[in-house]
């Protein structure tokens, strides 16, 4: 369980980092902060950035998806992406293996406890609860029967002892 939660936590942290770095970065979203100016941009006298006509595509050629893809490729080279995807795939496979193993063990336990080999999904919970309540009743009843047998035995033994004492007129005889 600890390993599974650790893998889930690693997967969650990795997903949050990748999401925030790709989709929430100012360059990918096209946001500009007025107090922060990149040093390689040119500005006019009003402080507005000048458009770079040599590096940019004409308007309408590239959509937002291509811009996002270009920004992703710029910030994360292919080698780093492959390593990150490999780590993610390894952690994801480990989590899936643990989940499938847990599910397999649960089905084995349900079959061994329930004795149901045809694997009906709706019949799994009913026999287990019925068997559980039957077991509780049987256990309580057998405990009650044992207590009654002990009381009956003690009453018989102590009754005989009392009768023997009366018969022997006070002489003590050890019976137990």
Curated annotation (Swiss-Prot):
GO function terms (MF aspect): neuropeptide hormone activity; peptide hormone receptor binding; pituitary adenylate cyclase activating polypeptide activity; type 1 vasoactive intestinal polypeptide receptor binding; type 2 vasoactive intestinal polypeptide receptor binding
What's the name of its gene?
ADCYAP1
Where in the sequence is Lysine amide found? 169
The organism's lineage?
A: Eukaryota, Metazoa, Chordata, Craniata, Vertebrata
Q: Which InterPro entries match?
A: Glucagon_GIP_secretin_VIP (IPR000532), VIP/GHRH-like (IPR046963)
Q: Output the GO biological process annotations, alphabetical, semicolon-separated.
A: adenylate cyclase-activating G protein-coupled receptor signaling pathway; adenylate cyclase-modulating G protein-coupled receptor signaling pathway; insulin secretion; neuron projection development; neuropeptide signaling pathway; positive regulation of cytosolic calcium ion concentration; positive regulation of ERK1 and ERK2 cascade; positive regulation of gene expression
List of residues that carry Leucine amide: 158
Q: What name does this protein carry?
A: Pituitary adenylate cyclase-activating polypeptide
Locate the region Important for receptor binding. Answer: 150-158
């Amino acid at each position: 369980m600890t390993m599974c939660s650790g893998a889930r936590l690693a997967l969650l942290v990795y997903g949050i980092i990748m999401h925030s770095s790709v989709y929430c970065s100012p360059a990918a979203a096209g946001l500009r902060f007025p107090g922060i100016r990149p040093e390689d941009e040119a500005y006019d006298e009003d402080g507005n950035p000048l458009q770079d006509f040599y590096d940019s595509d004409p308007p309408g050629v590239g959509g937002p998806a291509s811009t996002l893809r270009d920004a992703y490729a710029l910030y994360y080279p292919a080698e780093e992406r492959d390593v990150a995807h490999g780590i993610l795939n390894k952690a994801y496979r480990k989590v899936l293996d643990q989940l499938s193993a847990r599910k397999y063990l649960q089905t084995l336990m349900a079959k061994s406890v329930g004795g149901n080999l045809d694997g009906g999904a709706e019949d799994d919970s009913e026999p287990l609860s019925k068997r559980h309540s039957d077991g509780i009743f049987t256990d309580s009843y057998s405990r009650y029967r044992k207590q009654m047998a002990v009381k009956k035995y003690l009453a018989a033994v102590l009754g005989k002892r009392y009768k023997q004492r009366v018969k022997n007129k006070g002489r003590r005889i050890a019976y137990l």
